[in-house]
Amino acid sequence: MIAIIETGGKQILVKEGETIFIEKIEGAEGSKVTFDKVLLLDNKIGKPYVESAKVIGEIQKQGKAKKIVVYRHNAKSTHKRKLGHRQPYTRVKITGIVG
């Protein structure tokens, strides 16, 4: 069974037993999380969401992604700017798709 869920401003295709990386959500490691915004469930298409469908998962890890460096330089001047950013994420294992 497959589903497309909406979380963190993104749409993610999920299957039962799969591990996904999503934008950070609150919750401790090992706790259950429910996604109610299901856009597609097998052959049912929601308008905008499928009624009474939900995806259940378990939070495995809260972490930060690899650091990216943003460097800005203005030509013909001494202005330089270097910034780093690490995006927080949550790793979730999909345990069930109900609908």
Curated annotation (Swiss-Prot):
Record keyword Ion transport present? no
Q: Which SUPFAM superfamilies match?
A: L21p-like
Q: Which InterPro entries match?
A: bL21-like, bL21-like_sf, Ribosomal_bL21
Biological process according to GO: translation
Whether Ribosomal protein counts among this entry's keywords is: yes
Source domain of life: Bacteria
Recorded GO cellular component terms are: cytoplasm; ribonucleoprotein complex; ribosome
| Pfam families assigned to the protein according to its UniProt record, in alphabetical order | Ribosomal_L21p
Sorted alphabetically, which keywords does the UniProt record give? Ribonucleoprotein, Ribosomal protein, RNA-binding, rRNA-binding
Gene Ontology terms for molecular function:
rRNA binding; structural constituent of ribosome
Q: How does it assemble?
A: Part of the 50S ribosomal subunit. Contacts protein L20.
Q: What does this protein do?
A: This protein binds to 23S rRNA in the presence of protein L20.
Q: Please give the family membership noted in the entry.
A: Belongs to the bacterial ribosomal protein bL21 family.
Q: What is this protein called?
A: Large ribosomal subunit protein bL21
Name the gene that codes for it.
rplU
